[in-house]
Amino acid sequence: MKSFFGSFFGALFAIFLLVGIALVGFIAVIALVGVSQKVPTVADNSLLVLDIALPIPDAPPEFSANQLFAGLNEEQQETPVTLRDVLRAINRAATDPKIKGIFITGNLVPVAGYASSYPALKEIREALGKFKEAHKPVYAYLQFPFTPAYYLESVADQLFVDPQAEFILRGPSSSPLYYAGALKKFGVGIQVFRAGKYKSFVEPYIRENMSPENREQLEKLFGDIWREVTTTIEQARGLPPGSFEKLINENGLIDGDLAVKSKLGTELVSLSQVMDRLKTQYGSDERHHTFRQVTVSSYLGVLERNPKGQPDSGSKIAVVYAEGEIVDGEGSAADVGGERYAREIRKFRLDPSVKAIVLRVNSPGGSGFASEEIYRELKAAEETKPVIVSMGGYAASGGYYISVASKHIFAEPMTITGSIGVFGLEVNFEKIAADNGITTDSVTTTNPLATLFNPIKQKSDGDMAILQKAVDKFYDQFVDRVSKGRHLDVAQVNEIAQGRVWSGSEAARIKLVDDIGGLSSAIAYASGLAHLGDQPRITEFPGRKDLSEKLKELFKSTPRPPVAKIDPVELVGQEIEHELKDFRGLNDPEGIYARFPTDIRWN
């Protein structure tokens, strides 16, 4: 027996030793790969290539294990870049003598989420316009452009259209799934309490169709956004007002021939012909059999090695990205966790080198408790240094709640904001339990609230009154926060609140925001208030991770390829996952939410 245990533990030790050696070797290989990766360079007469098939988020994207292994492949995949990355690359390329133009490629497929939003595309579009002012051309190659992609690409000097191209141009839409019938069929009870007649998040759980109030607000919202999109495209392509929408309505899908005849494109030409033409004009990259080029991510690597215009002072601006649903607790990389964000904002508030905070909001809201946590820290910071808000695709409900703690708010015309309203939602399984012979009984103190949140019992009228009172209290607090933050009378706020969403352009008109502008405008404004000059140092949260942090995440995460090409099955899967995530995010400890649904499709 002694011999057995000796052999057993000896073998076990050997296994652990081998695993340890393998792990050390693995980490060493990864580190060597990082060190030995080819240093990016820019050849003379190069074009900067912007691949819009890759999502462009506001915040640095969640780490993927594929990025760690990218260096093992001779042909590295392009890694996703952020909005600020793209803007920085375009702005530097305008004055870089080696960069002669920009080439836009890839099919931007509208999917659920927050990346590549219209406000982000608008800011990139404006940067491309300034790039053209340096007398450098912008080219675009179009295969199957959806409206957001074409909105961006229409700024190009030359739009090369593939002979097999189909332009899929449609306006924004919303087709929510309604679960009330299914929930009733399966015996699941839903009880709702809300403040704000336009507060539509709960509708799929209690209705079988869209309410008149929600239809009213969405029709107005979509009209504002669509008007901005069509007007911008018509001006860029030299088309008469109203002609773009007329073309779409009369033809549906627009093929390449019609696109060129209608001035949506410059000429029909295959990709190989475009490559040959650009090789002739700018020189050839023999290794890759294409024209001389540098991708945005590679160009950023060059810029990191050759920083320009960064002041020697340690003073800086903190850019905080509130991108995703606001949830209670720490949250994940895809969420805005109330505790985590409040803690980081507190650090920036207490850091004397941080002279201003820019909060980039791209969130539909969420937990009322978490929104208040973040609001308090922002308000405390605003007492000692400028806090400026830049609104992205969404800054609605809880996203707007945290915004009003700031000194100044920037939004884009196509930002979705407002939604000053609150709701609570309780699920009970009383009927399904009864149908299956499950009963419940209880012993409590004299406190009537002891069984308030029993999931087997339907809430009584008295219970509902208690919960409605809590929702009304938070709504009044929301209105008060807006009233004080925006210097509006409570009556004025109530008139434009009620859970109604507004476009950024309308929000500026009714004084929910101060100015029309993007992230760059907000940073410039904050820099001016903090006296940091034209090119302030920036620190970001969430920030980019170093190798040790990436290795930690590698052992916690499932590797997945970067999202570039999306097949129809994956697209449906993402839609279902998005619907489920909406429900899973309802984790407020008090069951009170300031949340706007994100079932809008940008087509």
Stretches found by the model and what they are:
Residues 144, 249-254, 395-396, 499-500:
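Short helix-initiation/N-cap motifs at beta->coil->alpha
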Residues 1-78, 84-86, 173-256, 261, ...:
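Intrinsically disordered, low-complexity segments enriched in small/flexible residues
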Residues 160-161, 265-271, 410-411, 513-518:
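Short acidic-hydrophobic, aromatic-tinged amphipathic segments that line or gate anion-handling sites
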Residues 39-41, 46-177, 308-432, 472:
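Cleft-lining beta-strand/loop regions that shape enzyme active-site pockets
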Residues 107-112, 244-247, 501:
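Surface-exposed aromatic
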Residues 91-98, 129-136, 155-158, 184-188, ...:
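Sec-exported extracytoplasmic/periplasmic mature domains
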Residues 326-327, 332-585, 596-602:
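C-terminal structured domain segments across diverse proteins
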